[in-house]
């Protein structure tokens, strides 16, 4: 079955190409739920079984998923449901019962099948994912991302923000409601806040999957450095490279706000900044989705996000799958901005500072 290759998918863009760190799942639709069709459902299950068997990040788990799906299909477990969404939810629950994965899911009618224009990593081209940005206080810059869609609108907004706030003494990045996406926006930021080339995280993908479906990375991208890895695995290190013309942000204190809704690519950002000690993470442990992959159609009217790779700390070999990235300063998510401002030497509360954002 065909996949679209992405890097990390976002909650705002639940239909993401296959190497996106997918985001937390979106509801299939706010409209009436599509009717259940037995033939369509059975075709979706057959194609999903093949997809996970051939592509899932852990081959043994992929085989176990496939065996379960085929056994359930044979005994008629997917023969009748009140609607298509109930069927998709049941299949997702069955998958998670075999092996938990924060991204793996079957869903109904993703955006790409409804004809919505997609950015290279699955986000609508005209949506600016910078929710808020500006000065919270003299010298204290703030930017709030809903996701990392990798589109032109968001890239332009990030460029403007970095230029306008290049002399900030403190930078607060709010990822508390960031469901993920791609690497583009964080690479823009990394280029300004790191003062030397720095290894961030390591990303593994099954060699057979990359050969069959391609790679979400530009082979010549200096930010995705190919390194030696285990047999059957293609390993890359994501690195930060300072921009040729850097701003004062390379010396700024950086604070990253997190919550349990911080997911996927936003967790990639979290681990990268925590591991390198380039930022202080404030808030809650993140959502726990460390596997990247992509969305592929399953039969008629269904699609599945199938994880094909994992992102992890090169120092420990451990990812944040199922556990999340722990903050440096643990506070409830709604108090994270207050704490960041306090550490930045600002006496105002987060609520009052946001009302005067400029």
PLM region spans:
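Extended C-terminal subregions enriched in glycine
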Residues: 253-271, 280-287
């Amino acid at each position: 079955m065909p996949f679209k290759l992405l890097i990390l998918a976002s909650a705002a863009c639940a239909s993401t190409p296959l190497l996106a760190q997918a985001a937390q799942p979106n509801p299939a639709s706010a409209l009436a739920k599509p009717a259940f069709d037995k033939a369509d459902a059975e075709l979706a299950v057959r194609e999903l079984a093949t997809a996970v068997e051939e592509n899932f990040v852990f081959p043994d788990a992929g085989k176990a998923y496939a065996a379960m799906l085929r056994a359930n299909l044979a005994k008629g477990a997917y023969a009748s449901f009140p609607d298509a969404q109930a069927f998709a939810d049941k299949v997702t629950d069955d998958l998670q019962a075999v092996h938990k994965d924060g991204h793996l899911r079957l869903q109904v009618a993703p955006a790409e099948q409804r004809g919505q224009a997609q950015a290279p990593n699955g986000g609508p081209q005209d949506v600016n994912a910078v929710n808020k940005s500006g000065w919270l206080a003299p010298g204290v810059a703030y930017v709030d991302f809903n996701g990392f869609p990798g589109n032109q609108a968001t890239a332009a907004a990030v460029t403007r923000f970095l230029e306008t706030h290049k002399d900030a003494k403190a930078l607060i990045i709010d990822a508390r409601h960031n469901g993920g996406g791609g690497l583009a926006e964080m690479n823009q930021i990394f280029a300004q806040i790191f003062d030397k080339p720095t290894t961030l995280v390591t990303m593994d993908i099954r060699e057979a999957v990359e050969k069959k479906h391609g790679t979400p990375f530009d082979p010549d991208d200096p930010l995705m450095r190919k390194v030696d890895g285990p047999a059957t695995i293609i390993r890359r290190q994501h690195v930060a490279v300072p921009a040729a013309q850097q701003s004062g942000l390379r010396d700024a204190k950086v604070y990253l706000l997190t919550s349990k809704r911080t997911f996927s690519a936003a967790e990639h950002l979290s681990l990268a900044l925590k591991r390198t000690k380039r930022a202080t993470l404030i808030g809650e442990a993140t959502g726990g989705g460390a596997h990247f992959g992509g969305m592929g159609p399953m039969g008629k009217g269904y699609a599945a996000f199938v994880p094909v790779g994992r992102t992890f700390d090169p120092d420990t070999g451990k990812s944040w799958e199922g556990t999340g990235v722990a903050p440096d300063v643990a506070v409830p998510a709604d108090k994270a901005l207050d704490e960041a401002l306090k550490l930045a030497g600002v006496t105002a509360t987060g609520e009052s500072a946001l009302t005067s954002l400029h």
